[in-house]
Structures are given as C-alpha cells and as structure tokens.
C-alpha cells in the first residue's frame, strides 16, 4: 500500500541521513563509516566492525564499573560530543547501549536521530526525536522540537550514562528527577563525581554545564 511505501521511504531517508552525518565526522571515539551507497532501491553503509559489545552489555555482565574506568569512558565520549557540538550537531540519544567498546576504547554510535541545527537554533533535519527513558531530559518529552534543545541536552544524557555506569541502575525518568531529584549515589563515589552527575542532570537546561 501507499502508506507502507511511504514508511519504507522514510526509513531509507533516515538511514541515509545517519550514514551521511557520520561519514563527515572524524574523531577517535565516533564510529567510522567507510562507504555509503544505494543499490536496487536499498540504502547501505559500510562501517567499522566492533565485536566487544556496548557499555550496557558490560555493566549487565559485570556490574557497576569502577569510578576510574567510568570516568575514563565518559571523558572520551565527552570529547566526541564536544567535537560534534562544534559542528552544530546534537546526538540526542546518548546512552550506554550506544557506546561500544573497541579495544577498550569507547565508540559512540547511532546517529539516527541526531539533529543538525544552524546558529539560530533552527532545525535543519527532519527526523523525529526519540526518547530513551532515564537518559532523555525533560525537553525531549516536549512538543517544541529542536528549538528546545542545545548541547546541554546531550550533557544530561552523558550524566545519566555516568550514573548508570557507576550504579548499574537506569536513572529515574526525567519527570521523577524533576520532582524528587536524583537518588543517593553509593558512598564509594567521590563527592566531585556525584556533584558532576547532579549538575549534568539538572532538569533546567540553563543549570547544566554548557
């Protein structure tokens, strides 16, 4: 039917958008794309193969990470975010499942809902925004679109990812954090790291690190 064809076409365009976005990026902690092409009406891309699983897999198998290890991963992904933000790209789906390990180095993947925005904050891509509960801030639940987003949207998700790595638990949804704050972190976590998570996961964008 026409509706199914439209849906397939929308997935094809989303797939190509992700591939074209990543293929323009060159950072040691962002997945590498080697080729993008279409054949017989189907879109393909060739990316680096990473066999070691995601940070989510590691935590599910081994439990919470040490603070030293978790911070090392987060700093490297933070560097990747700083790089894409400099190119006016928001990832918008930072979470442990989207960070793979390649020879013990974290690699950010899944730019399928990333957004490119211009200097005035207007969206220049049209794919819908996804929501990963526990990792998405309040603004991703709103109907305002990308005008309500900025780099601090990714910062919230990065802080939520650090929370998960250190506790082995998915953080509460943003609405609960907004009402009740974050649950207490384990005593073994240093005050500085606990404060960094709390700051990154502030409900209001203006209160997060920029």
Ranges and model annotations:
Residues 1-24:
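AlphaC helix of the eukaryotic protein kinase fold
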Residues 27-30, 55:
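Non-catalytic scaffold residues of the protein kinase domain
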Residues 36:
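Activation-segment/catalytic-loop signature of the eukaryotic protein kinase fold
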Residues 40-54, 58:
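Conserved short submotifs of the Hanks-type protein kinase catalytic core
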Residues 73-74:
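Activation segment signature within eukaryotic-like protein kinase domains
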Residues 85-101:
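Catalytic-loop of the protein kinase fold
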Residues 134-210:
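C-terminal lobe helix-coil module of Hanks-type protein kinase domains
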């Amino acid at each position: 039917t026409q509706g199914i064809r439209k849906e397939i076409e929308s997935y094809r365009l989303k797939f190509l958008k992700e591939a074209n976005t990543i293929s323009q990026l060159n950072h040691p902690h962002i997945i590498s794309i080697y080729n993008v092409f279409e054949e017989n009406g189907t879109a393909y891309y060739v990316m680096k193969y990473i066999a070691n699983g995601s940070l989510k897999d590691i935590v599910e198998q081994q439990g919470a990470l040490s603070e030293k290890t978790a911070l090392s991963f987060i700093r490297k992904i933070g560097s990747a975010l700083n790089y894409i933000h400099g190119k006016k790209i928001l990832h918008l789906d930072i979470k442990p499942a989207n960070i793979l390990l390649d020879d013990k180095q974290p690699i950010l993947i899944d730019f399928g809902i990333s957004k490119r925005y211009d200097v005035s904050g207007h969206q220049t891509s049209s794919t819908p925004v996804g929501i990963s509960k526990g990792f998405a801030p309040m603004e991703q639940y709103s109907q305002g679109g990308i005008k309500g987003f900025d780099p601090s949207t990714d910062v919230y998700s990065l802080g939520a990812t650090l929370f998960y790595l250190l506790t082995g638990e998915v953080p509460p949804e943003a609405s609960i954090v907004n009402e009740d704050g974050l649950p207490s972190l384990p005593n073994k976590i240093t005050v500085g790291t606990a404060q960094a998570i709390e700051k990154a996961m502030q409900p209001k964008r203006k209160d997060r690190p920029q």
